[in-house]
Design a protein with these regions (language model features):
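Short-chain dehydrogenase/reductase
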Residues: 2-121, 210
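Catalytic loop of short-chain dehydrogenase/reductase
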Residues: 23-32, 103-133, 138-141, 145-190, ...
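A short hydrophobic alpha-helix cap/turn motif
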Residues: 39, 93, 145-146, 186-191, ...
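A glycine/serine/threonine-rich, flexible loop-to-helix segment
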Residues: 59, 169, 190, 202-225, ...
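Short, small/polar-rich loop/turn modules that mediate ligand/substrate recognition or access, typified
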Residues: 189, 194, 251-253
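Conserved SDR Rossmann-fold cofactor-binding beta-strand/turn motif
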Residues: 194-204, 244, 257-259
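A conserved structural motif in NAD(P)-dependent oxidoreductases
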Residues: 225-236, 247
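Short C-terminal tail/terminal secondary-structure segment
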Residues: 241, 252-267
């Protein structure tokens, strides 16, 4: 199925729904691909950015979507998180989907031996990459309840399940993120709030540039996946669209791999 065919099949699927996107940094961001897919399906979106460096990019991209809301937010600051959700509530009157595509680790903690990870670096990676999902989900819950439920979707990677060279502290943070998905799904399920993760294969994004040897990872994956190719951001976006839609109403607590099947291989 081509991207155009997918858009045609999902047009209007999310009409009247609202979403909040954390993690757009560049036009190559997976979060932006997800936002584009949700918008094509009819969802009205709000975006956040952290700092002046990213504000221009987010405003330029989000400005191409009609009716979008753009707000500053540092996910390590509870007051800023509250301000974002208060504004989203005031503007949208509730929320249907939360996209969490936020991760960060110090560059020096993404190479060398994991045992040499600094205490500050470990805590920082956990706070931004894992705990933020809990903080955002908690803040989103009252807005979801106004709409009778909702969908939380986060992004993870195989490095949260297996040792991946030069992923180090981020792999540990992703492992915590994936377990958080399960606990949040159990907590929020009675409120009809679903929580799932997408484990995407390696994709050329701005964030990927910080991983040493990333081009080698791409080449290895292309050769060893069952589909003999790397995935595209649009394929991850289609999965997020599915999880945000009523089509996935019975799915929660899952980590869905979109990696051309690499995760099933034993080598």
């Amino acid at each position: 199925m081509t991207n155009e065919t997918t858009q045609s099949a999902t047009s209007g699927l999310l009409r009247g729904k609202t979403g909040l996107i954390f993690g757009v940094a560049h036009k190559t961001s997976i979060a932006w691909a997800i936002a584009s897919a949700l918008n094509e399906a009819g969802m009205r979106l709000a975006f956040t950015y952290q700092g002046e460096r990213l504000e221009e990019n987010v405003r330029e991209l989000a400005g191409t979507l009609e009716g979008s809301l753009i707000l500053p937010c540092d996910v390590t600051d509870d007051a800023q998180i509250k301000a974002v959700f208060d504004e989203v509530d005031a503007t949208f009157g509730g929320l249907d989907t939360l996209i969490h595509s936020v991760a960060f680790a110090k560059k020096e903690d993404l190479s060398g031996a994991f045992v040499d990870t600094s205490r500050d670096g470990y805590l920082l990676a956990q706070d931004i990459s894992a705990y933020s999902l809990t903080a955002l989900s908690r803040a989103a819950t009252p807005l979801f309840e106004k709409n009778g439920g909702g969908s939380v979707i986060t992004l993870t990677y195989l490095g949260g399940e297996r040792v991946v060279e030069n992923y180090n502290v981020m792999g540990v943070a992703k492992a915590a993120l994936e377990m958080s998905v399960r606990y949040l799904a159990a907590d929020l399920g009675p409120k009809n709030i679903r929580v799932n993760a997408i484990s995407a294969g390696p994709i050329k994004t701005l964030a990927a540039r910080g991983i040493s040897g990333f081009s080698n990872i791409l080449s290895y994956m292309e050769e060893h996946t069952p589909l003999k190719r790397n995935v595209e951001a649009a394929e991850v976006a289609d999965t997020a669209l599915f999880l945000a839609s009523p089509l996935a109403r019975g799915i929660t607590g899952e980590v869905i791999h979109v990696d051309s099947g690499f995760h099933i291989m034993g080598f």
